[in-house]
Swiss-Prot record:
Organism listed in the record: Aspergillus niger
Pfam families per UniProt: Cytochrom_C (PF00034)
Chief localisation class: mitochondrion
Protein's UniProt keywords contain Electron transport: yes
Family, similarity comment: Belongs to the cytochrome c family.
Modification type N6,N6,N6-trimethyllysine: residues: K80
Location in or out of the cell: Mitochondrion intermembrane space
Any GO CC annotation of this UniProt entry: mitochondrial intermembrane space
Gene this chain is encoded by: cycA
Protein name as annotated: Cytochrome c
PTM notes: Binds 1 heme c group covalently per subunit.
Function comment: Electron carrier protein. The oxidized form of the cytochrome c heme group can accept an electron from the heme group of the cytochrome c1 subunit of cytochrome reductase. Cytochrome c then transfers this electron to the cytochrome oxidase complex, the final protein carrier in the mitochondrial electron-transport chain.
Keywords: Electron transport, Heme, Iron, Metal-binding, Methylation, Mitochondrion, Respiratory chain, Transport
């Protein structure tokens, strides 16, 4: 269906989603601290489990996925299905539109 893959979304809406759903555990800026989850700066084009100085699960390190718009689109729908064994305690964003908005924001904010 139309929600099957990434399409550019609304960055401002994505920023709000990040603040309410992600910012408790993640920072995005260069040099930002790791919190419960890793800092996300430089996320796009990086493999899973590679943010310097963060203690990942083996599942995350071994997933061998490269983060881009489409892998994030799948992952954020159901993180534990995409990477079984991840410690990210987030149920996912079921609406494709919300994932598009969030990923559009992440592309800008983590670059």
């Amino acid at each position: 269906g139309k929600d099957a893959s990434f399409a550019p979304g609304d960055s401002a809406k994505g920023a709000k989603l990040f603040q309410t759903r992600c910012a408790q555990c993640h920072t995005v800026e260069a040099g930002g601290p790791h919190k419960v989850g890793p800092n996300l700066h430089g996320l796009f084009g990086r493999k899973t489990g590679q943010s310097e100085g963060y203690a990942y699960t083996d599942a995350n390190k071994q997933a061998g996925v490269t983060w881009d718009e489409n892998t994030l689109f799948s992952y954020l729908e159901n993180p534990k299905k995409f990477i079984p064994g991840t410690k990210m305690a987030f149920g996912g964003l079921k609406k494709g539109k919300e994932r598009n908005d969030l990923i559009t924001y992440l592309k800008e904010s983590t670059a």
